[in-house]
Amino acid sequence: MFKNIIIVVAVTLCALFTNEHVVYSANLEHGEQIFSANCAACHAGGNNVIMPEKTLKAEALEANNIKNISAIANQVKNGKNAMPSFSRLSDSDIEDVANYVLSKADKGW
């Protein structure tokens, strides 16, 4: 019994401290469609035509403390600075586009 507890704790700690982003069971293809229709005008290829230093590339997301699905979804839903709110999108659409963005950032766009 003690051995099982140790294994569970070890696996949990590994999962907590890994640097890999977890892309949840989102529909990345749907996220790409939402991105193309709503985000690509300013963020084509992970860039930013309004504020060039605030791209969707992994390094920029990390530097701006936007390093997980929740943070990206919050930015999409509420907007910030020059980025408008996309709260008209459904929560499912926002989650899919956030997963798509993080997936692309992890792959270098």
Curated annotation (Swiss-Prot):
Location(s), subcellular: Plastid, Chloroplast thylakoid lumen
GO CC entries: chloroplast thylakoid lumen
A single GO BP: photosynthesis
The UniProt record lists the keyword Transmembrane helix: no
Residues noted as binding heme c in the record, renumbered to the chain: 39, 42-43, 83
GO molecular function: electron transfer activity; heme binding; iron ion binding
Predominant subcellular localization, coarse grouping: plastid
Pfam families according to UniProt: Cytochrome_CBB3
Post-translational modification: Binds 1 heme c group covalently per subunit.
Keyword Chloroplast: yes
Protein keywords: Chloroplast, Electron transport, Heme, Iron, Metal-binding, Photosynthesis, Plastid, Signal, Thylakoid, Transport
Signal peptide boundaries: 1-25
Subunit relationships: Monomer.
Task performed by this protein: Functions as an electron carrier between membrane-bound cytochrome b6-f and photosystem I in oxygenic photosynthesis.
PANTHER family per UniProt: CYTOCHROME C6, CHLOROPLASTIC
Family: Belongs to the cytochrome c family. PetJ subfamily.
Name of the protein: Cytochrome c6
Lineage: Eukaryota, Rhodophyta, Bangiophyceae, Cyanidiales, Cyanidiaceae
